[in-house]
Amino acid sequence: AREAVEKLLEMIPAGSSVTWGGSMSIRDIDIPAALANAGKYKVYDRDKAPDRAAATEIYLKAFSCDYYLSSANAITEDGVIVNIDGTGNRVAAITFGPRNVIFVIGMNKLTQNVDAALARARSLAAPVNTARFDIQTPCKLDGVCHNCLSDDCICNYIHYLRHSPKGKHKVILVGECLGY
């Protein structure tokens, strides 16, 4: 994981503005601390926002950042990146806005195909995230996707990145388990 953080820091030029989504993979390997400690980036960290309004401003800055960092719920053997999202902030930033998007993805998220990737996202990542955020959905109760339409559903947006505009998206595959 240390090598992944070093590679990430090499990929981001000094003076760049950087933010990230609510990724456990990003947190698992202490990327926010590495960026802050490097002292050469303009870092927007919503976790350090003093209140909800300030956090919302950081969400919006993601669209004009030089670099947006994310993980994925799954990546297929042929490179399709799959994400689900409740509010859309992550998939929106991955799709539009930031000049560059770097994915940091653990090998535990590698799946054979898109169907397996979506199943992984909905049946493994979503129930764990609903528990993490204490969201009251059926999958939180039993760990099984019910394809719910609850007001608290975190699977409102399903995003497949199958081809990237030249140079916008980059992937760092980490040879260990990261996130869920």
Language-model regions, residue ranges each:
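N-terminal active-site beta-alpha-beta segment that forms phosphate/nucleotide-binding
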Residues: 1-59, 64-69
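Conserved phosphate- and dinucleotide-binding cores of soluble alpha/beta proteins
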Residues: 62-180
